[in-house]
């Protein structure tokens, strides 16, 4: 693997952006506490507005959001290009756009800040859940239900920030729907869209086409960064600066049809099994700039025991090379969910997901079809992904395997030295002086795959302070999805500080 370069650009971020104290520190504590609690109440309502995709029915959740925004005196816009697939947006005005109606919303100095979320959730089978996934159960200090983590909880945090900004306006005797929010230079846009879980074509892609002003901004913040992961007693806060793309393959493996009483090596299913084994082997670590900065941050902060396990992870070429990496080692080990995430983001991955073959129990299959889901790092092209697949299959099996790359979406990445990252680092460090802040590549896609190519830098930042024992990463699309009331309230304060740090006069 290629040696790392140093230092990373990201390591220089996080300077003190709040010399006069955090903006949230100037808010009446009673108000701050109330808004934090209301984030939990809002999340309960959003969970109960079941919006499983497919089919979506996001309009249910959109109507809840519209009502909550109207209670703040705002006049949100609604866009439903497909029946029951609703989208919502609202804008709070800053002084820059009020002074210059023709201001470019992507202007680096005065352009808008976009907070955006998706309204849909993945299905939730009741099996394995200890609560009804769509009841919005509140117990043990947590809000439980599908979407609590992905990502109605983050939307509730964003809504909490909007509530605080509206309170600023009302305290000055102003109308938050029409007047400039006191102290705000940039516009703040909150947009919630449909269909993220199945690609966004029926959601954010249509919004970009038909309601581009809902998204146009100097920078956007969305899901999946800023929450704590505890490793070897240290709190790590990954800030999402990039996300992997995807390449989906259909492999058709040929063999010879025959009677099962006379088996031989021409069995297509046997060949497919070999292909599965070869395809799924972890490839070499790819030190793209984002991964260089990530590993450098971990090396600088983690104790030797944890780093030893990380170094083994960097060197593995088969899953068996690091068979014990998922086991907890008190005082020395990284959290299992961190190791699994690192294994995924440090390289292009290839995961066999569907294998179909055979017609009867007594017939040797002459054909097998294998579906492979590949997730690719920034810089991996369609041609490179195809070439990698062919190389994995090997020259000996290549004559029997037809490789068809059926779908491709390039990875997206953003500058690691953007001003808003420094502000986010400062907001977290002001609360946690021992925080390990690092850039992260998401192993999955978000709606940033639409906004980044449209010229809107987009970072994953939905901050939560989590209990060290909480396996938050496993809650994404998992059973008993939940987030604590305390985490939501903390997230509202941190995100408010970031918004004001970036958008204030």
Task: Name each model feature, range by range.
Residues 9-148, 168-186:
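Acidic/His- and Gly-rich active-site-bordering loop/insert found
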Residues 45, 64, 68-72, 271-282, ...:
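Generic non-transmembrane alpha-helical segments
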Residues 92, 253, 374-376:
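Hydrophobic beta-strand positions in extracellular immunoglobulin-like domains
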Residues 143, 149-238:
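Acidic/histidine-rich catalytic neighborhood of metal-dependent amide-processing enzymes
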Residues 171, 178, 212-216, 225-234, ...:
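Acidic-enriched catalytic cores of C-N bond-cleaving enzymes acting on peptides and small amides
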Residues 276-285, 306-310, 415-465:
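Active-site-adjacent substrate-binding region
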Residues 360-392, 409, 413-425:
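C-terminal substrate/ligand-recognition segments
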Residues 408, 434-503:
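Zn-dependent metallopeptidase/amidohydrolase metal-coordination segment
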């Amino acid at each position: 693997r290629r040696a790392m370069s140093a230092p990373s650009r990201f390591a220089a971020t996080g300077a003190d952006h709040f010399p006069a104290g955090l903006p949230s520190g100037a808010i009446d504590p009673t108000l701050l506490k109330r808004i934090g609690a209301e984030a939990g109440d809002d999340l309960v309502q959003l969970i109960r507005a079941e919006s499983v995709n497919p089919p979506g029915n996001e309009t249910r959740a959109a109507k809840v959001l519209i009502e909550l925004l109207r209670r703040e005196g705002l006049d949100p816009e609604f866009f439903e290009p497909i029946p029951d697939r609703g989208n919502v947006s609202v804008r709070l005005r800053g002084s820059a756009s009020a002074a210059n109606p023709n201001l470019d919303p992507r202007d680096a100095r005065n352009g808008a800040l976009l907070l955006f979320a998706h309204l849909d959730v993945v299905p939730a089978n009741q099996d394995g859940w200890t609560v009804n996934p769509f009841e919005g159960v509140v117990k043990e200090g947590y809000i439980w239900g599908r979407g609590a983590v992905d990502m109605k909880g983050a939307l509730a945090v964003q809504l909490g920030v909007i509530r605080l900004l509206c309170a600023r306006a009302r305290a000055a005797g102003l109308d938050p729907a029409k007047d400039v929010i006191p102290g705000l230079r940039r516009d703040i846009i909150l947009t919630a869209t449909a269909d993220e879980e199945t690609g966004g074509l029926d959601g954010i892609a249509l919004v970009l086409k038909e309601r581009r002003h809902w998204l146009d901004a100097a920078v956007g913040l969305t899901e999946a960064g800023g929450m704590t992961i505890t490793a070897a007693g240290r709190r790590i806060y990954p800030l999402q600066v990039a996300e992997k793309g995807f390449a989906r393959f259909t492999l058709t493996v040929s063999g010879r049809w025959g009677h099962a009483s006379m088996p031989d090596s021409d069995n297509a299913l046997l060949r497919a099994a070999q292909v599965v084994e070869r395809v799924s082997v972890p490839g070499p670590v790819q030190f793209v700039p984002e991964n260089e900065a990530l590993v450098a941050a971990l090396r600088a902060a983690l104790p030797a025991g944890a780093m030893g396990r990380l170094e083994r992870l960097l060197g593995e070429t088969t899953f068996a090379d690091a068979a014990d990496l998922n086991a907890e080692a008190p005082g020395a080990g990284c959290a299992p969910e961190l190791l699994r995430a690192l294994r995924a983001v440090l390289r292009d991955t290839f995961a066999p997901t569907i294998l179909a073959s055979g017609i009867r129990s007594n017939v040797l299959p002459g054909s097998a079809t294998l579906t492979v889901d590949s997730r690719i790092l920034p810089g991996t092209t369609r041609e490179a992904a195809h070439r990698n697949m062919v190389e994995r299959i090997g020259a000996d099996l290549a004559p029997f395997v037809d490789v068809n790359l059926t779908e491709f979406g390039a990875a997206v990445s953003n500058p690691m030295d953007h001003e808003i990252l420094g502000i986010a680092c400062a907001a977290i460090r002001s609360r946690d002086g021992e925080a390990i802040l690092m850039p992260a590549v998401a192993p999955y896609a978000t709606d940033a795959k639409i906004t980044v190519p449209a010229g809107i830098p987009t970072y994953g930042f939905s901050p939560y302070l989590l209990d060290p024992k909480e396996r938050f990463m496993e809650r994404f699309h998992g059973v008993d999805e939940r987030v604590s009331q305390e985490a939501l309230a903390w997230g509202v304060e941190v995100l408010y500080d970031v918004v004001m740090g970036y958008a204030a006069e």
